[in-house]
Regions:
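Short sequence/structural segments immediately N-terminal
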Residues: 3-5, 13, 26-324
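Sec-dependent N-terminal signal peptides
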Residues: 12-20
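Flavin (primarily FAD) cofactor-binding/catalytic cores of flavoenzymes
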Residues: 23
């Protein structure tokens, strides 16, 4: 007879199987029981500041370049409370990154959303005169962050990515290709040659004037930094100068027309406002009317070179007709 028919041995097996089943059911029941407390998560310690010297141990090349950058003043001074830990003023506390050497354990402004990256810069730069309009500027509205034009580590004028004035212009041209094309026309501001810069006329951080135009004083556009003789104040002003500005007659970047005019000849510019060609021929010495009024038969060639007589087209101190 085999062992399976031995009563004593079978009884022992049955008892062992019952105990094992009961133990297993107890464990699974405890896991499935509603409200059973989950094991507590491991405590996460926040990163701490370790100072720039810890950063230099691995990032020596960046540290050497940073010493020539205007932002290095944050490291050596205490203007904003970041002395000896300038790296962490932008990248945040670095203890975890120092331990793990993982990029995931440090803030990377270049990978943040533009608005979030700008907040870091504006912590220090918000109240500077050239930056007061940054939040509502056209660059900010179009998601162009500070780091698109500025380098935090490299050495350049005012921390710019570009080092030379001509390179700054090319930096702007990287986005404004249509404007750059205007500077290739025969009559232009000498910007491609490096004689002037985009920021001579535009404030890239924002302005109270359209197109981020620089202001000289009050609401006067930046044109008058160089062309001050055209602004007055005049006793007799030419209304478009005050109401529309220089671009009523001139192309600001470049033109195919002399003096960067919007039209091929001066009289065609004048006729945009002073046109009375729809009025019948007048009697001798009579005004043709029009809005604004004109006093000559402009269909006659003798009256089509306006600036032959009206020489002070921007404004005059002595003559209401802008003759002199």
């Amino acid at each position: 007879m085999t062992d399976m028919f031995r009563p004593g041995k079978n009884a022992r097996r049955a008892v062992l199987l019952a105990v094992a089943a009961l133990f297993t059911a107890t464990i699974w029941g405890a896991q499935d029981k509603p409200g059973a407390p989950a094991p507590p998560p491991a405590a996460t310690q926040p990163a701490e500041y370790v100072g720039s010297q810890a950063c230099q141990m691995c990032h020596e090349d960046i540290s050497n370049a940073f010493q020539k950058n205007p932002h290095h003043q944050v490291e050596t001074g205490n203007t904003h409370g970041w002395a000896t830990r300038a790296c962490e003023s932008c990248h945040g506390p670095g203890s975890k990154h120092a331990d793990s050497a993982s990029a995931a354990d440090i803030r990377q402004p270049a990978k943040l959303k533009p608005a979030d990256a700008d907040k870091i810069c504006l912590t220090c730069h918000l109240n500077q005169p050239t930056h007061v309009g940054r939040i509502n500027s056209s660059h900010a509205r179009n998601q162009v962050s500070c780091t698109a034009c500025h380098s935090i580590h490299k050495n350049g004028p005012n921390g710019l990515v570009a080092r030379k004035q001509a390179d700054i212009n090319k930096l702007c041209a990287g986005c404004h290709a249509d404007v750059w094309a205007s500077f290739q026309r025969p009559y232009k501001h000498r910007l491609p040659e490096g004689a002037m810069s985009c920021v001579d006329c535009h404030n890239p951080h924002g302005s109270f004037l359209p197109r981020s135009i620089q202001t000289v004083s009050a609401n006067e556009p930046g044109c008058f930094k160089c062309h001050g003789d055209k602004v007055g104040p005049f006793t007799y002003e030419h209304a478009p100068m005050r109401l529309e500005g220089c671009t009523a007659c001139h192309m600001p970047h470049g033109s195919s027309n002399p003096r960067m005019l919007t039209r091929s000849q001066v009289q065609f510019v004048c006729l945009e406002c002073h046109s009375n060609l729809a009025v019948p021929a007048p009697a001798a010495n009579a005004s043709l009317g029009g809005v604004p009024p004109a006093f000559h038969d402009l269909r006659s060639p003798r009256y089509q070179n306006c600036t032959l007589c009206h020489q002070k087209v921007h404004g005059s101190y002595v003559d209401r007709g802008l003759l002199r």
